[in-house]
From Swiss-Prot:
Keyword Ribosomal protein attributed: yes
Similarity field: Belongs to the universal ribosomal protein uL29 family.
Gene Ontology BP terms: translation
GO cellular component: cytosolic large ribosomal subunit
GO MF entries: structural constituent of ribosome
Cysteines paired by S-S bonds: none
Keywords: Ribonucleoprotein, Ribosomal protein
Domain of life: Bacteria
InterPro entries found in the cross-reference section: Ribosomal_protein_uL29, Ribosomal_uL29, Ribosomal_uL29_CS, Ribosomal_uL29_sf
The protein, known as: Large ribosomal subunit protein uL29
Organism of this sequence: Actinobacillus succinogenes (strain ATCC 55618 / DSM 22257 / CCUG 43843 / 130Z)
């Protein structure tokens, strides 16, 4: 997910994307806690995608 792709979305779409990412992060954290997560890099990717979405939301709020 690129920041430019996120900037082209409206606030409602960004909030929906944020909710999806937070749900995915929760699932990955539960898998990691139970030892079922094989691809641990996914946690880092999701965390950074959440940060990207939040950054774009803050930029749009400032406009």
């Amino acid at each position: 997910m690129k920041a430019q792709e996120l900037r082209n979305k409206n606030v409602e779409e960004l909030n929906a994307e944020l909710n999806n990412l937070l749900g995915e992060q929760f699932k990955l954290r539960m898998q990691a806690a139970t030892g079922q997560l094989q691809q641990t890099h996914q946690l880092k990717q999701v965390r950074r995608n959440i940060a990207r979405v939040k950054t774009v939301l803050n930029q749009k709020a400032g406009e």
